Amino acid sequence: MSKEKFERVKPHVNVGTIGHVDHGKTTLTAAICTTLAKVYGGAARDFASIDNAPEERERGITIATSHVEYDTPTRHYAHVDCPGHADYVKNMITGAAQMDGGILVVAATDGPMPQTREHILLGRQVGIPYIIVFMNKCDMVDDEELLELVEMEVRELLSEYDFPGDDLPVIQGSALGALNGEEQWEAKIVELAEALDSYIPEPERAVDMPFLMPIEDVFSIQGRGTVVTGRIERGILNVGDEVAIVGIKDTTTTTCTGVEMFRKLLDEGRAGENVGALLRGTKRDEVERGQVLAKPGSITPHTKFESEVYVLSKDEGGRHTPFFKGYRPQFYFRTTDVTGDISLPEGVEMVMPGDNIQMQVELIAPIAMDEGLRFAIREGGRTVGAGVVAKIFD
């Protein structure tokens, strides 16, 4: 029993395979599970069970994703793999599978291909902080110089998108070789696992980040003042803390004089909890749904940003027709809709359902945001797109 308890405190890290179609992402996923189970213990998963990915719905978008888990001596990994290119695009944009690091799979026989580039760009846009490269199918390349050339190309491509191409780990291996139990290639999988352990830092836990709570509801309580309710997204709210009310209107600051949960008074509320916060001297009409309560100075309101957007297909309940510049939908951030104007990249006249696109947005009211914030695009209450804030313009 004590072993079980010990396992649970291992740091938990989310990773995933990205890269061009048929470069071996799913084979590598199976090879990692199988090899690490053999070396460190744990459950092996075969190719077929991973490739047969169940479809999930995230905000109404259908995404096929396989989730596997594996352990190294120091960490527990949750790993996502998608069968199709479109699934990757949707996954990365919706944040359905948040990644603390990505494993970019590049076949040594092909070198970088169009989707290699697209996945690196998406990784940059949606904020995947670390990338490790696994050069696959190296058993099919006899020429050492060719391997070096491919590695150089991949490193240059990563540098082009602001990843540290010169410094990040590149492992040359063969996923199939490792799956077939060939020792030299199994060793490369262990090397990849060691690179994950050493190169991807332990993610900061939500509770350790600066306090933020999206406001869902506002009540005034006779004789006590104004209470705002919501689910704490990150950090801790202590009674007596100074808090900022950010978004929609000018930012104001007040003091939290009470925290309650299920009508019980608490000393603090923590990330993941639904609480009510009593605000000193704040009137009922000074706060509204869509604003956030946050540690002062930790987040600022903005109206203009660049985003990466996936437009739902007709089958997913999205639009049946394309949209053009001048389109003015609602952008749903956390708890509220705000109208915004879009501008499309140069040379793009229209956007079709099922496309993914970079677009600049200008909202009619400011929203508390930082890069990496997810949103939905809605028309009359139905979701027609999903996006992520890639870059904020002041």
Curated annotation (Swiss-Prot):
Using the UniProt annotation, give all residue ranges assigned to the region (G4): 136-139
Locate the residues binding GTP.
Answer: 19-26, 81-85, 136-139
Task: Name the enzyme's class.
Answer: hydrolase
Q: Which reaction does it catalyse?
A: GTP + H2O = GDP + phosphate + H(+)
Q: Where is this protein localized, as stated in its record?
A: Cytoplasm
Q: Which residues bind Mg(2+) per the record?
A: T26
**What GO cellular-component annotations does this UniProt entry give?**
cytosol
Q: Which residue ranges are recorded for the region named G2?
A: 60-64
Q: Which domain of life is it from?
A: Bacteria
Annotated region (G1) at 19-26
Q: Which InterPro entries does the entry link to?
A: EF-Tu_GTP-bd, EF-Tu_GTPase, EFTu-like_2, EFTU_2, G_TR_CS, P-loop_NTPase, Small_GTP-bd, T_Tr_GTP-bd_dom
Nucleotide-binding among keywords: yes
Q: Where is the tr-type G domain?
A: 10-204
- The protein's predominant localisation is cytoplasm
Q: EC number(s) for this protein?
A: 3.6.5.3
Q: Which UniProt keywords apply?
A: Cytoplasm, Elongation factor, GTP-binding, Hydrolase, Magnesium, Metal-binding, Nucleotide-binding, Protein biosynthesis
Q: Does the keyword Protein biosynthesis apply?
A: yes
What molecular function does GO assign, one term?
A: guanosine tetraphosphate binding
Q: What does this protein do?
A: GTP hydrolase that promotes the GTP-dependent binding of aminoacyl-tRNA to the A-site of ribosomes during protein biosynthesis.
Could you identify this protein by its name?
Answer: Elongation factor Tu
Organism expressing this protein natively: Vibrio campbellii (strain ATCC BAA-1116)
* Gene (UniProt): tuf1
